[in-house]
Amino acid sequence: SSWSVDQVVAKIRGEVGTKVNLVLLRNNDKIDVSITRAEVSSPTVEAEIVDGVGILTVSRFNGETAVLARAEAEKFLTAGVDRVILDLRGNPGGEVSAAQGLAGLWLDGQTVLTQRRGSEIIRTDKSTGKPILGSTKTVVLINGGSASASEIVAGALRDHGKATLVGEKSYGKGSVQAVIRLSGGSELKVTESRWFTPNGKNIDGKGIEPDVKVELT
């Protein structure tokens, strides 16, 4: 077929509970399949313990991220984990509040970022929640796909001395933008402010350099 994956998915998607009939081709034989559409949930947090090290992988930041991460962190402590790897590779970001909650596993109501317009600080965001991993040795993995909220967390944990960053330079998304709709249907994206790490570094267009450079796969 000349259809792209996105085109196929668009055809299959539909209202939850309804059925879709598919014809599959296997070894030149056609197979009719009927499936019932359902909501697909992809958790933003996955965790495992390998050789006594707790590995927390966060794929994006949304409303459930901080809650899921805290639940997994509590399991780490119950299991006696004393070292944690926070994997933010390929995480494009998401909600700042989720970044505050994730950082709150290590930070105790401390600044995770400031937003500035020119030289004026217009907003300060702090970590939320109890820092149950505050004394746990932590490594944060980043790469060129780690952006926005991922960079907020990575930058904050390093600036506060809670983690060592390992991997490759991050994406470099350190601005807050607004979209202005123009006549004729066009849009103009305007940078409203820039955000800075707790130590006052803006990474927009520059990214965060890891403490230990390693090409990660």
Segments from the language model and where they lie:
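Cleft-lining beta-strand/loop regions that shape enzyme active-site pockets
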Residues: S1, V5-S183
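Well-ordered beta-strand positions in beta-sheet-rich domains
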Residues: D32-S34, E187, D211
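Short hydrophobic-aromatic micro-motifs
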Residues: L56, L188-V190, I203
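Short, intrinsically disordered/low-complexity patches at protein termini
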Residues: E120-I121, K137, K189-V190, K213-V214
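Short acidic, Pro/Gly- and aromatic-enriched capping/linker segments at domain boundaries
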Residues: L182-R194, E209
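Short, acidic, Ser/Thr-enriched surface-loop or helix-capping motifs
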Residues: T197
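Conserved functional hotspot residues or short segments at active or partner-binding sites
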Residues: I203-E209, K213-T217
